[in-house]
UniProtKB/Swiss-Prot annotation:
It comes from Bifidobacterium longum (strain NCC 2705). One of its GO terms (cellular component) is cytosol. SUPFAM superfamilies: NusB-like (SSF48013). Keywords: RNA-binding, Transcription, Transcription antitermination, Transcription regulation. Residues 141-150 have a biased composition (Acidic residues). One of its GO terms (molecular function) is RNA binding. Belongs to the NusB family. GO terms for biological process: DNA-templated transcription termination; transcription antitermination. Residues 135-190 are annotated as: Disordered. This is Transcription antitermination protein NusB. Involved in transcription antitermination. Required for transcription of ribosomal RNA (rRNA) genes. Binds specifically to the boxA antiterminator sequence of the ribosomal RNA (rrn) operons. Pfam families: NusB.
Length: 190
């Protein structure tokens, strides 16, 4: 229950920053220093707000990429920030299972959004999860590239039977093999 409350408090902060067109981290600093009538923000709410602020551009690009018919900037403010919280948990945290992130987003949407929002949010977050699970993790792409580079270097240093080095890779590092797929999200063009 504590994390559910933290998500709601993080949503309130993100919503307020979005509505006021205020810098998220500046507003967060204000809320931490002067919580007002509310209890201080839970640590997990602070972590969410900082995480969304740090990764907002990538989160929004990912949501835009997987959204059908709606760009993030056109979504309702509450919907948009519920999606940002869940996308941050899905893409950037390891301690929250994807299903939990989706279920928590749906719980917020059912109480705070219109009747169509939960289905839209569920579909969009499911697409984000599917894409995340289909793509190699950034660490594994880097490890594969390191292994390929080590294999190429080892093969280049091995002498051939005839002493011919024409089959070794050239010194420019060019290779006939395709490059490993990029794990970065590419922006979409409207």
């Amino acid at each position: 229950m504590a994390r559910s409350t933290a998500r709601k408090r993080a949503l309130n902060t993100l919503y307020e920053a979005d509505e006021k067109s205020q810098d998220i981290l500046s507003l967060l600093d204000e809320r931490i220093a002067h919580p007002g009538a509310q209890t201080p923000l839970p640590d997990y709410a602070i972590e969410i707000v900082k995480g969304v602020a740090e990764h907002r551009r990538q989160i929004d690009m990912t949501l835009d990429e997987h959204s059908t018919g709606w760009k993030v900037r056109r979504m309702g403010v509450v919907d948009r920030n519920i999606l940002r919280i869940a996308a941050w948990e899905i893409l950037f945290t390891d301690d929250v299972p994807d299903k939990v992130a989706i279920d928590e987003a749906l719980a917020l949407a059912k109480t705070l959004c219109d009747d169509d929002s939960p289905a839209f949010i569920h579909g969009l977050l499911s697409a984000v999860c599917t894409a995340k699970n289909a793509a190699p993790a950034p660490e594994s792409v880097a490890e594969e590239a390191d292994e390929e580079s080590s294999d190429s270097a080892a093969a280049a240093s091995e002498p051939t039977d005839e002493g011919d080095v024409s089959d070794s890779p050239d010194s420019s590092g060019a290779s006939d093999e395709p490059a490993a797929p990029s794990a970065e999200i590419q922006p979409t063009v409207d």
